[in-house]
């Protein structure tokens, strides 16, 4: 599993952080232990280690580079990944056909920029988790729960 985070705000957008935590080896040498309480300090260290013009592995399994949202989505699409964008007008996640190796795209509390959202519609299937508004962390938990249910039934 990988987590992609994009930071599009000032002072120097867009930063792409890719996280593919290393699970084997000794903590502190081959890998880092990432607890919920450590997330902000780890992200701060990763952002600090950014160097213009290079994709840099800051910790084992944690990279940072300058890359925009549409560029990343395009790369994932070209690799054959199935992209899903969360949209209140999308198909309900409970009935949607979620294909193997999915990537879910969600914005912050403001949503995605309208221009990027329009372009992403051509690459992504639009899905919704329901009629209510949730925090991003809740959305991630709901999507993971739905994927777990499908995996348990052999549907993924």
Give residue ranges: language-model regions.
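Catalytic cores of processing enzymes, dominated by hydrolases/peptidases
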Residues: 88-90, 94-101, 144-149, 153
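Short, hydrophobic beta-strand segments that form beta-sheet elements in well-ordered domains
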Residues: 82-88, 104-107
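Structured adenosyl-cofactor binding patch, chiefly the S-adenosyl-L-methionine
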Residues: 116-156
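Flexible, charged surface loops at secondary-structure boundaries
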Residues: 75-81, 97-101, 122
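Short, glycine/serine-rich, charged loops/turns that create anion-binding
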Residues: 10, 90, 110
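Glycine-centered small-residue hotspots that permit tight backbone geometry or close packing
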Residues: 106-111, 128-132
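RNA substrate-binding interface of SAM-dependent RNA methyltransferases
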Residues: 1-85
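Strongly charged, low-complexity linkers/loops
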Residues: 93-108, 114-117
């Amino acid at each position: 599993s990988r987590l992609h985070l994009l930071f599009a705000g000032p002072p120097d957008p867009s930063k792409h952080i890719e996280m593919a935590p290393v699970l084997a080896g000794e903590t502190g040498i081959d890998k880092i232990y990432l607890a919920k309480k450590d997330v902000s300090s780890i992200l701060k260290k990763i952002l600090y280690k950014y160097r213009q013009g290079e994709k840099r592995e800051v910790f084992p399994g944690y990279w940072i580079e300058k890359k925009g949202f549409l560029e990343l989505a395009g790369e994932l699409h070209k690799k054959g990944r199935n992209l899903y964008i969360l949209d209140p007008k999308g198909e309900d996640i409970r009935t949607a056909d979620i294909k193997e190796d999915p990537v879910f795209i969600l914005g912050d509390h403001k949503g995605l920029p309208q221009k990027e959202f329009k372009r992403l519609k051509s690459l992504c299937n639009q899905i919704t988790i329901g009629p209510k508004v949730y925090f991003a962390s809740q959305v991630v938990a709901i999507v993971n729960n739905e994927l777990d249910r499908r995996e348990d039934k052999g549907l993924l």
